[in-house]
Regions:
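Juxtamembrane helix-entry segments on the extracytoplasmic side of multipass membrane proteins
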Residues: 60-67, 97, 135-144, 190-191, ...
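Membrane-water interface at transmembrane helix exits
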Residues: 51-55, 82-86, 114, 118-122, ...
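Transmembrane helix-loop-helix hairpins at the membrane interface
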Residues: 139-240
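Alpha-helical transmembrane spans of integral membrane proteins, capturing the lipid-embedded, hydrophobic core
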Residues: 40-44, 68-71, 103-115, 146, ...
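Short acidic/polar alpha-helix capping motifs at helix-coil junctions
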Residues: 36-43, 99-100, 114, 126-130, ...
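Residue-level signal for alpha-helical transmembrane segments in multi-pass membrane proteins
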Residues: 49-52, 65-66, 73-81, 112, ...
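Juxtamembrane helix-loop-helix connectors linking adjacent transmembrane helices
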Residues: 86-153, 238-239
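N-terminal, membrane-interfacial amphipathic/helix-forming hydrophobic leader that caps
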Residues: 1-98, 229-240
Length: 240
């Protein structure tokens, strides 16, 4: 039976973000306590480093060091917190496998939505200027280096927020990880960055709940973030 595009989209959303593959596997009490302590310390340090990194002047080489330090905080906190699972996703045939293709599609869909929204943002100077300032790090720096750091940070953030932090929360993990992820960007002073973090955080948290692991969220995040870095500047330039 051939389904229409709307039915296909509904089935995709259900498989990617709604219907869990398997029941979660909680940590033993001692391991959970350790995870929570490591996660709490890492969150405070990471939020401070992120606020510092986003306030560094575009073109300053210190930005690279700061963002690499941030990736190290998230990744180290995640690894030290305990075991992290890759997770499994649903396939079109009802089987289970690593959610690679599904996550690439989800990241691409998320990217498309943001790029359409950027056409609106570009027409509002008070919203556009902070975004331009953030993108100046790529314009005035080395794009390949910034792209590499962007991917690295995306992986590290997912290891921490949808890996360690999610596993440390017994209840409401989707809501709490989304809110905390968004709050870490408040120090940037860029409202649209906070909004983007909330949306991406919610999507990847739902994906974490469905797949039971970090692989899907990692692929979705880096597909979106790398795409935004490469495609957002030319999209904004369309309406200059």
């Amino acid at each position: 039976m051939v389904r229409g595009p709307v039915a296909e989209l509904r089935a995709f959303i259900d498989a990617a973000l709604v219907r869990p593959v398997a029941a979660p596997q909680p940590d033993p009490p001692a391991a959970l306590l350790r995870r929570r302590l490591v996660v709490a310390v890492s969150l405070v340090i990471g939020a401070a480093v992120l606020a510092w990194a986003l306030r560094i002047r575009p073109g300053d080489a210190l930005f690279y060091a700061a963002t690499l330090a941030l990736a190290a905080v998230w990744a180290l906190g995640a690894v030290l917190s305990g075991r992290l699972r890759l997770g499994l996703g649903h396939t079109r045939r009802g089987a289970r496998q690593r959610p690679v293709v599904q996550s690439l599609a989800l990241g691409g869909l998320l990217l498309a939505v943001f790029l359409v929204g950027a056409l609106v943002v570009a027409r509002v100077p008070v919203l556009r200027e902070p975004v331009d300032d953030l993108l100046d790090h790529a314009r005035f720096g080395s794009l390949p280096v910034v792209l590499g750091i962007t991917v690295l940070n995306g992986v590290a953030e997912e290891l921490y927020f949808r890996g360690a932090l999610y596993a440390a929360l017994p209840k409401h993990a989707v809501a709490v990880t989304t809110v905390l992820y968004a709050l870490t960007t408040v120090g940037s002073g860029i409202p649209l960055l906070v909004l983007a973090a909330a949306v991406v955080g919610l999507v990847t948290a739902l994906q974490r709940r469905v797949t039971g692991g970090i692989l899907g969220p990692v692929i979705t995040h880096i597909t979106w973030s790398a795409g935004m870095l490469l495609l957002l500047p030319p999209v904004l330039d369309l309406v200059r």
